[in-house]
From Swiss-Prot:
Domain JmjC: 564-709
Main subcellular localisation: nucleus
Compositionally biased residues, Polar residues: 116-139
Full protein name: Bifunctional lysine-specific demethylase and histidyl-hydroxylase NO66
Length: 888
């Protein structure tokens, strides 16, 4: 047992391997690994060989296929050549047979000078394969296999002259065949060179369809003529090879008998007639040879009414909501096709990142519950009457002016002159009724354009006595009617949104319409991106699809038909009444009043949810549009100074306002209000957005004011020019913000004291900063809309408008900025100004102070009468002054 246990213990005990055994084991495994490596290399080699063989088989297969295709192509070409040769032989045989028949029918009308041998050959139908025939006059003639000919000496003047007299086309690409890309040119009316390549009667359907005659409506001869038979100018009938003369006069084919008849009257001249060749496909359209010309049986001529009827069947039904009149069928452009119905908009999520109440409570603004003021609940005294015709409105307007002028007892002559001018407008003619012809011609553009009718003309006095600020206020009252401007600024301005609903669809139609847009695009050079934007908003993605170049009317309506929204920038440049609205309102707001027009097809949305940096007035002119307004996402977005990017729907909360604007309604919302709008499935939308008060906040004033205050303080106070302490970097800075020390507190207090002591602006500095904002307005503003009554009054004087001029300049000279001569485009030119001496400034200030009252030139606060007249003349020449009485 001990011996067994000893062996067991020896077997279980860990054995220490020797160096020799270790080397044996390593050698064994190395041989085994080498064997496996060789096997793997052999397998890879076999795989490469198999892949190479497979690739070689594929290459050979492709080569065999290419060779087969090449052989098939060669066989097809041979078959095509054989078919073409057969067709040529068949055509030549038909031509010979036709000549034989003609010779039998008209033996008496054969050409003079032809020998009896030639006539006998024609009667017997013998073919003369290109051999020369001796004529009786000693000349030779070659009989053709086909009827096409080449004339080099004008021997067909009797036929060709009639052809040219009855045809009217040019030699440019705008001729009747310009649709095929070819042109026709000739230099001699009596000499035509017809190509030797004839046409073939063997056309398949594809050829007939591809080579439809573009000249059918230009060349309509005798519709009762029998197909296959035609007559020349001498009354001789001859056969046609299947085409009709009514389709194209170049399809005439002259047979030998007709040639002889024509030559008998013009003299016996040698004529060379080339044989006919088979037609080839894919050749350019040859007007002389009628290549690619379909036969009459395959391409019958249709009248113009039939063509229009056929085109009308292919066109889609016009959109029921499209206000544009249908275009003629020849334009090949659908007026305003409706896009296919899009899926309904996704519902607004119930949750948002920041609730509207929190946002508005933090800023101190009132709740953003939108107020609605329906017109049927309030008196509508200021609403414009419904217009049945433009002449009635002009009559009413003129009568109002006449009545008001008659009430002014001190200006009876003035009223009579105005009455004459207005009667001239009333009849829509330009006959002069008094001696104001020169003044009226000078202001022809202003007087001929019909004015905006707001319905409140009776409430004002004579135009030349009105304050331009009050005129702007009246225009705002017309927009917000029945809400007054006082109520609007007290309850809604920069606080809440406001909707005015009125059941008057035509309330704003005088501002813009589809027809006005179409005329504007046709008559003016509007550019994409500069004047027109084409946008879409689908599946949460907003795209701008602006091409390059001019925005043509067909392109715009094409985009509209595809479901794109059209945004027209600065439309007031081209629409007089909209320009009058904007230029009048800018007098009240003392800032640029811009306008954009948005045209949206049914069931579409052109822009993603966003907010703007302007006070927005949305004027719904036509159609319907659903508007949804949301609270500003953050506190810093309330009354935002810059526009936002595009928001996703899930980033917005529930809308504060969700309603539909109808034609005649108006919606106001402050800057910073997130909004989006979408049209209904069967309703388009045309609306105007008036933008007001952009960059008109206290922040803008301080941005102009504080740099000048700091500059002046640095110049006058030594404390601001002293150096900073050496240890400031050790105690102040972002890295030291959490550490408190005596040095840090001392530096903070001293900096605050410097600001409070030296950076407080003076009144003069505030005045100068406001003048800078006024200067910016003079540059941006639209030129004033001059009424006919104002254009006559240009030695009491007053400023033409309250909001100009704006003083500015240097010490030695002052600049008076004005916007009378501004371009209609936004900031197109540099600001307009005139320079005056500092001693002349009191005269300008006096005119600004007494506005809108008139002031005698002699009362201007200047020392000498010459200086008064000089200043008044300079202002009047620039259009800044208006006289109390009109010039005669």
């Amino acid at each position: 047992m001990d011996r067994i246990s000893a062996y067991a213990a020896y077997g279980l005990a860990p054995k220490k391997t020797s160096k020799r055994s270790t080397m044996k084991i390593a050698k064994h495994f190395s041989k085994k690994n080498a064997k496996k490596t060789k096997e793997a290399m052999a397998a890879k080699k076999e795989a490469r060989k198999a892949a190479a063989k497979a690739a070689l088989r594929e290459v050979r297969k492709l080569e065999r296929k290419a060779a087969a295709d090449k052989a098939a192509k060669i066989a097809a070409d041979k078959a095509a050549d054989k078919a073409a040769a057969k067709a040529a032989a068949k055509a030549a045989k038909k031509a010979a047979k036709r000549e034989k028949n003609i010779a039998k029918k008209q033996p008496e009308k054969s050409a003079a000078g032809v020998t009896e041998n030639v006539q006998k050959q024609l009667e017997n139908g013998q073919e003369n394969n290109g051999t020369l025939i001796n004529l009786s006059n000693g000349k030779q003639h070659q009989k053709p296999k086909a009827a096409k000919m080449s004339s080099s000496n004008g021997s067909f003047s009797g036929i060709d002259s009639d052809f040219l007299n009855s045809s009217d086309f040019g030699s440019t690409e705008d001729s009747f065949m310009s649709g095929s890309g070819d042109s026709f040119d000739y230099s001699n009316n009596s000499d035509f060179d017809f190509d030797s390549d004839g046409d073939s009667n063997d056309f398949d359907d594809s050829d007939a369809a591809a080579s439809s005659c573009a000249s059918c409506e230009y060349f309509d001869m005798d519709s009762n003529m029998v197909v296959g038979q035609e007559s020349d100018t001498n009354g001789n009938s001859y056969m046609h090879n299947g085409t009709t003369q009514s389709e194209d006069q170049f399809t005439e084919e002259y047979t030998l008998s007709s040639i002889f008849n024509s030559t008998s009257s013009s003299g016996a001249n040698p004529i060379k007639v080339e044989p006919r060749k088979a037609a080839k496909r894919n050749e350019p359209f040859d007007l002389n040879n009628n290549k690619n010309k379909p036969t009459a049986a395959k391409q019958p001529k249709m009248s113009l009414k039939q063509e229009q009827a056929q085109v009308g069947k292919q066109r889609a039904d016009p959109a029921p909501s499209c206000p544009l009149p249908p275009r003629p069928s020849k334009t090949m452009i659908k007026s305003c096709p409706l896009p296919p119905k899009a899926p309904a908009a996704k519902p607004v999520p119930n949750k948002c990142r920041l609730s509207s109440r929190e946002s508005l409570t933090k800023t101190g603004a009132k709740s953003c519950r939108l107020s609605s003021a329906p017109a049927d609940k309030m008196a509508n005294k200021m609403a414009a009457p419904s217009r049945k015709s433009s002449s009635k409105n002009k009559n009413n307007d003129n009568n109002n002016i006449d009545t008001n002028n008659k009430k002014d007892a001190n200006n009876k002559k003035d009223a009579n002159n105005n009455k004459d001018i207005n009667n001239k407008k009333d009849a829509n003619n330009n006959k002069d009724t008094n001696n104001n012809k020169d003044n009226n011609n000078k202001n022809k553009l202003s007087s001929n354009v019909s004015q905006l009718v707001t319905g409140n003309e009776k409430q004002r006095g004579p135009v030349h006595l009105e304050n331009s600020i009050e005129e702007g206020k009246r225009m705002l009252n017309w927009l917000l009617n029945p809400i007054t401007s006082e109520t609007f600024f007290e309850q809604y301005w920069e606080r809440n949104a406001c909707q005015v609903k009125r059941k008057q669809p035509n309330y704003f139609t005088q501002l813009i319409s589809f027809q006005m847009i179409d005329e504007m695009l046709i008559e003016n050079q509007l550019e994409f991106t500069t004047n027109i934007d084409v946008t879409t908003y689908k599946k949460g993605v907003r795209q701008t699809l602006n091409p390059v170049g001019r925005a043509m009317s067909p392109a715009i309506w094409g985009y509209y038909g595809d479901g794109c929204s059209i945004r027209i920038l600065n439309p007031s440049t081209y629409l007089p009444k909209l320009r009058q609205l904007c230029s009048t309102m800018q007098e009240f707001f003392h800032c640029l009043v811009g306008a954009n027009v948005y045209l949206t097809p049914p069931n579409s949305q052109g822009f993603a949810p966003h907010y703007d940096d302007i006070e927005a007035f949305v004027i719904q002119v036509e159609g319907r549009k659903r508007w949804r307004l949301y609270a500003p996402p953050h506190q810093s977005d309330v009354l935002a100074r810059t526009s936002s990017g595009n928001y996703k729907q899930e980033e917005l909360g529930q809308p504060l306002f969700d309603a539909v604007l109808e034609a005649g309604d108006i919606l106001y919302f402050p800057r910073g209000t997130v909004h989006q709008a979408v049209t209904e499935p069967k309703q388009h939308s045309l609306h105007i957005t008036l933008s007001v008060y952009q960059q008109q906040a206290y922040a803008n004033l301080l941005e102009v004011l504080m740099p000048s205050v700091l500059e002046r303080a640095i110049k006058h106070h030594l404390s601001l020019r002293r150096g900073l302490p050496l240890h400031i970097w050790q105690h102040v800075g972002l890295a030291k913000g959490g550490q408190q020390s005596e040095q840090r507190d001392q530096l903070m207090n001293s900096t605050k004291q410097l600001v409070q002591r030296y950076l407080v602006p003076t009144e003069a500095q505030i005045d100068a900063a406001v003048d800078q904002l006024a200067k910016r307005f003079q540059h941006e503003a639209l030129p004033p809309y001059i009424k006919p009554e104002e254009s006559m009054r240009t030695t009491k004087v007053r400023l033409l408008r309250r909001q100009h001029p704006a003083p500015g300049g240097r010490r030695q000279q002052l600049r008076v900025y004005y916007y009378v001569d501004n371009a209609l485009e936004y900031c197109k030119n540099e600001p307009n100004y005139m320079e005056i001496q500092p001693t002349e400034a009191p005269a300008v200030e006096a005119l600004m102070t007494t506005y809108p009252a008139y002031l005698k030139v002699g009362k201007l606060p200047l020392r000498s009468a010459d200086r008064r007249i000089e200043v008044a003349t300079a202002l009047w020449e620039r259009g800044l002054l208006m006289t109390e009485k009109p010039f005669k």
